[in-house]
Structure formats: C-alpha cells, structure tokens
C-alpha cells in the first residue's frame, strides 16, 4: 500500500461495515456460485488476501472449515481478531507474506490488488497468490476496470455519498483524477460528519484492462476460467456497468472480477 494512503475507515475499521453494508450477501453469494462453477468439490480452506474486517471470511466460515485472512493494516487485524476471534488473521504485506501452506481458494477483494501501483508490485502480489495455491486452487480477484475509466463513460470527477445509520451519519465528496500514462486513479474524499472536523482521505489505484489482468494471472501460473464486470456472472463486453446512485466509494459498477485456477 502506498504510504501516502490515508482513510477514515482504516483508522476506524468499526465504521467500515456501516459505510459499506452487504445486507444482501452479494459478495458471499458470488463466491459460493464460483465454488460450484469452478471447483470439483466444496472447498475446505480459503485465504482472503486483504481481508479487512474479516466480514466475508465470517460468512464463508459457515461452510468452509479453515478460513484465513491477511491484511496490511494492524487496525484491521486487531478489529477482526476482536470481533471475529474464530478466524485466523495475520498481519502482512500482500507482496511478501508467506504462510507456509496452500488453500483450496485464494481471494483478493475490495480493490486490494489495485493498491499494487507498479508492474512489479502486481507481479509480487500474484506470486503471493501462487505461493498459497496448489494445482486446482481457485483464485478470485477484483480490480478496478481500466476500460470503464479510461475508454468508457465510467470516470466521474466528483461523486457524492451519504451514510445514514443510527450509529454513524456522514456525507462525503470524492474528487477523482486520472494519470493515463501510468493508468492510475487518484481519489481525494472529504467526510463531513456532524459536530466534527472534516476528515480527508487519499488513495491511488492501478487500473487494469481485462487483457492485462488475464496476462498477469497467466504469468503467475493461473488460467482464467471466467471474467466479468458484474457479480452475477453475466456475459458482457467488460466495459463496466455504471450505477447512478449516490456512492461513498465512488467505484460501484467499475470492477473486473476474475476467476482463475492454478495450473
């Protein structure tokens, strides 16, 4: 993760699930569908690289015996261990961590791979995926879709969002800019929280085209079995499907989802 990255939600991981609720279990449903499609038998182990608060792992733990997570941020690791003590959570850099074992499923969600800004960062992260995979392991990753941002109408300079829950109320304004040569998206987000000083986030993300993601995974020993720009496995031209709804993250409908098996 770039050292200039800062986020209210990294400082306060307890707020993450309020800001980004998953009441309909969309991500868990996608994963379970992928297991049925791309694995010969139900998985017995899963590693989530960039696991955040461990919410997805907790969902998957109802049917998967061994659920491991890795996150770069000590704040996320501490929160996940406190709230979800049954999970096996480790702190580490996705470019370098080695757990000394393999898993039936390796996942990397929430744009975590998009934090790998350079080609070498991307390669090293995929090497981490491969180090924890055996032949037939299913890899599931999502990244920000360069087609949507650079070629289509997915780029919006200014996006507003609202969080209105009993525990947390705030509005946000996200300002985006593109570096086309390096295929990077930069986002500055300002939180307006009643009765508190404004809080400013900053992040940079690497944008990947579908063919780049496919080649990256192939070079790391994975064969892509499916790639979509949605969680419903609908075949499209991978240009991205844009939501017009207010969006705190500013990235809804702008992702690629890849499903690949270790050779």
State each model region's role.
Residues 136-143:
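Conserved beta-strand signature within the Rossmann-like core of class I S-adenosyl-L-methionine
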Residues 1-50:
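Conserved class I S-adenosyl-L-methionine
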Residues 123-135:
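A short glycine-rich, Lys/Arg-flanked "PGG" loop and its adjoining helix->strand segment in the class I
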Residues 207-263:
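C-terminal lobe and adjacent flexible extensions of AdoMet/dcAdoMet transferase-like proteins
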Residues 143-215:
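SAM-dependent methyltransferase
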Residues 54-96:
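Class I SAM-dependent methyltransferase SAM/SAH-binding core
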Residues 95-105:
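A short acidic, Gly/Pro-enriched loop at the edge of an enzyme's catalytic core
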């Amino acid at each position: 993760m770039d050292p200039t990255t800062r986020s209210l939600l990294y400082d306060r991981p307890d707020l993450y699930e309020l800001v980004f609720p998953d009441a309909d279990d969309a991500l868990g449903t996608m994963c379970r569908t992928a297991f049925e499609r791309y694995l010969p038998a139900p998985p017995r182990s899963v590693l989530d690289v960039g696991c955040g608060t461990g919410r997805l792992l907790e969902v998957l733990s109802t049917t998967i015996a061994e659920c491991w997570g890795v996150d770069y941020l000590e704040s996320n690791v501490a929160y996940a261990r406190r709230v979800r003590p049954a999970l096996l959570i480790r702190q580490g850099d996705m470019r370098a961590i080695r757990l000394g074992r393999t898993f039936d499923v390796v996942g990397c969600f929430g744009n975590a791979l998009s934090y790998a800004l350079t080609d070498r960062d991307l390669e090293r992260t995929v090497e981490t995926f491969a180090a924890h995979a055996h032949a037939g392991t299913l890899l599931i990753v999502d990244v920000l879709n360069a087609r949507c941002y650079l070629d289509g109408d997915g780029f919006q300079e200014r996006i507003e969002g609202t969080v209105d829950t009993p525990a947390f109320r705030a509005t946000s304004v996200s300002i985006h800019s593109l570096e086309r040569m390096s295929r990077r998206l930069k986002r500055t987000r300002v939180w307006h929280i009643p009765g508190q000083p404004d809080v400013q986030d900053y992040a940079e993300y690497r944008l990947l085209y579908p063919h780049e993601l496919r080649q990256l995974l192939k070079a790391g020993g994975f064969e892509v079995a499916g790639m979509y720009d949605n969680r419903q496995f609908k075949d499209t031209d991978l240009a991205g499907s844009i939501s017009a709804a207010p969006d705190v993250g500013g990235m809804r409908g702008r992702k690629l989802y890849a499903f690949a098996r270790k050779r």
